[in-house]
């Protein structure tokens, strides 16, 4: 089903009419903050996964970007996301809110103009291919290094950060791989182009520390789910050679969900298929996003209006 409407500065406009001027500063300089969010079909209707956490991160990205005042607060953006999904009639979709420099900014400062906000939704059919979750995918260690935090603010999801990922992913695909693993400036594992990474070493789940990575909402979800399942989880530096000798390696992100890596740099990882721990986390995550997990109530925001805009399914959580 085609998207019908896009939300722009508090108005739903027809999909075809949601256009930008060629000289929009955010287009030229990457001065935009955004989020990638998923809406899933549940027994109680469509619901957005961890919407509040995504919008909180968006607000943090805007603060890092230097905007002193935004046209909408977090509660209004949560409601706008819900309304946009509802207006388009989707049961499952991808949700993309963007805050961008729309006016001024030619002197390379966010103080010269003002930000606008848009929210788009579209149907989502998977990111790394239909067989990725079952069989896992192939990855390489990229020749491109992940940003150092004082070069590009790595905790902010900012458009200008993403050419780093585009270069690495393009190289990876042209070499015949599905995804790229990026190292930090110290040569330790950071993350993939659009996902965080986990490694299973001697039965322990290990993930890189927060230093140079974008702290993913899916990553945070898996940390909770893994501990719920009784797994030991540690954030610690991971070397490149530990990737090759790991029992399992898996990546996670809003778009990819949870995907095993069956091969890295032509080296088979574990059994060469999605491992048991990865599989258990896939199942727990899928249950959570579809409303079938004990954590679902606190993590899902219903799309259908119940008079309490933006409230989660958990009636005990405070409404925004």
Task: Give names to the regions the model predicted.
Residues 1-72, 76-83, 105-320:
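Helix-start/capping segments and mature chain N-termini
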